[in-house]
């Protein structure tokens, strides 16, 4: 752990969030106010942290040397009953993002609709299944109408906190690892358009996936980022991206620091040295990353989700 803190602190620079800054994609790098910027993000999930501990966890992420937080927005947390939205208390995503800004951290928002995250139904509300013929994560009219209604509510909470408006939000994700599920580019494009109509039309949009999946669902007008874990050959992971987009910034949007436990199986562990070595290599090469997870938190109530049907 001391090794990890030391390495991350080496990259620590002043990251106060300034009013009306710019965050753009340059030739091979991200640009913050026109200058090269490497993202060092901590993935944390606000529903897995009691609200009284939010600020303390955020401060711990910054103490690691992180300059950003990466957060999913969980649809089924905020709309547990159809048409009834809750962004209060432990669901107050605006307050969470404001706390990040208070401590000089940027924010990457990932509003789904599907988030995976080993969460109940991947973040999709249970009540969608009351319509027996619904097609989830497709251009099903019922699904898309309710998806847009939710994303507009997210926009009401967060759209005025993007970096061009003086807030800390630098990027917003479209869908989540969709190439592992389907190949419907038209659906991904429809979700992108919903995000833009939710007032995220001036912030950088991106999609994440495994390196083998972008030819299935990658959109030309979105930034592409990779997901992989400790022990991966980092050059190999980015090789295909380099072939498809040689001038794109490199970012591992989920650098898996560990793995989830499954019921009845031994506790999963990973070699911390491999994680540290991977982080060091990415920092040495100017590759941006989000450490997934930096703080795992706790699955309260019934929110833990299954990854397999068995």
Model-derived regions: residue spans:
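N-terminal carbohydrate-binding accessory modules
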Residues: 4, 17-68, 98, 102-104
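Bacterial N-terminal signal peptides
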Residues: 5-14
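Conserved, mostly hydrophobic/aromatic
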Residues: 34, 61, 69, 100, ...
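The substrate-binding groove and active-site-proximal loops of carbohydrate-active enzymes
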Residues: 39-50, 74-92, 129-149, 173-184, ...
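Aromatic-lined substrate-binding rim segments of carbohydrate-active enzymes
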Residues: 54-120, 192-203
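Aromatic- and acidic-residue-enriched segments that line the glycan-binding/catalytic groove
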Residues: 83-91, 101-102, 113-138, 152, ...
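Catalytic-core region of carbohydrate-active enzymes that cleave or remodel glycosidic bonds
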Residues: 101, 105, 197-198, 202, ...
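Active-site neighborhood of glycoside hydrolase catalytic domains
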Residues: 142-221
